[in-house]
């Protein structure tokens, strides 16, 4: 089975070993589980990574709850990615996720009424979630009040994050999160 009937997931390799267990590329007929994972902890890592991206894309006001629109946006963005890079869009997405997920974050600890920032390692599932959220947010921000379509903006964001380009919203936010964590060590 292929994603969107076009892209084979069996040839995709996950470069980052820490998130390998949390990026699911098992073949599915339809990328729609209907929220069966919602009540169980850590079950969202069993969702296909493209479905998780689709779910992140339907978070903004206009597309809230409209999965078919988000499905079409991601499908057309994958076609654009393939036409620009001549690669499998799934492998480009997996590289983008591993490049855009922050490895270190900051938590706030209270010591006697004083708040002290402390750097902590990020869990692998949170890295994947944060990377997908930053990619979707960057695409929405690039297309807001712009003539460019959301499909083009999503494709640009994924390609830039896969190439570790600082022009990518996701990569620049990841760098700023890690910079703050480095200062809080």
From Swiss-Prot:
Segment forming the signal sequence: none
Protein name (record): Small ribosomal subunit protein uS7
Keyword Methyltransferase: no
Listed PANTHER family: RIBOSOMAL PROTEIN S7 (PTHR11205)
Protein keywords: Ribonucleoprotein, Ribosomal protein, RNA-binding, rRNA-binding
UniProt entry tagged with the keyword Ribosomal protein: yes
HAMAP family: Ribosomal_uS7_A
Pfam families reported for this sequence: Ribosomal_S7
Subunit structure: Part of the 30S ribosomal subunit.
Molecular function GO labels: rRNA binding; structural constituent of ribosome
Role of this protein: One of the primary rRNA binding proteins, it binds directly to 16S rRNA where it nucleates assembly of the head domain of the 30S subunit. Is located at the subunit interface close to the decoding center.
């Amino acid at each position: 089975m292929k994603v969107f009937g076009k892209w084979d997931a069996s040839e995709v390799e996950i470069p980052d070993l820490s998130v390998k267990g949390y990026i699911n590329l098992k073949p599915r007929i339809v990328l729609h589980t209907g929220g069966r994972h919602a009540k169980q902890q850590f079950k969202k890592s069993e969702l296909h990574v493209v479905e998780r991206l689709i779910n992140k894309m339907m978070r903004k006001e206009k597309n809230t709850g409209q999965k078919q629109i988000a499905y079409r946006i991601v499908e057309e963005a994958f076609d654009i990615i393939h036409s620009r890079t001549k690669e499998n869009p799934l492998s480009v997405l997996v590289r983008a996720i591993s490049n855009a997920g922050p490895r270190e974050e900051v938590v706030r600890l209270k010591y006697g009424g004083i708040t002290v920032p402390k750097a902590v390692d990020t869990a692998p599932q949170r890295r994947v979630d944060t990377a997908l959220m930053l990619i979707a947010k960057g695409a929405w921000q690039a297309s807001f009040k712009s003539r460019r379509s959301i499909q083009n903006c999503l494709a640009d964001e994924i390609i830039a994050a896969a190439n570790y380009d600082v022009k990518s919203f996701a990569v620049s936010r990841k760098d700023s999160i890690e910079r703050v964590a480095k200062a809080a060590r």
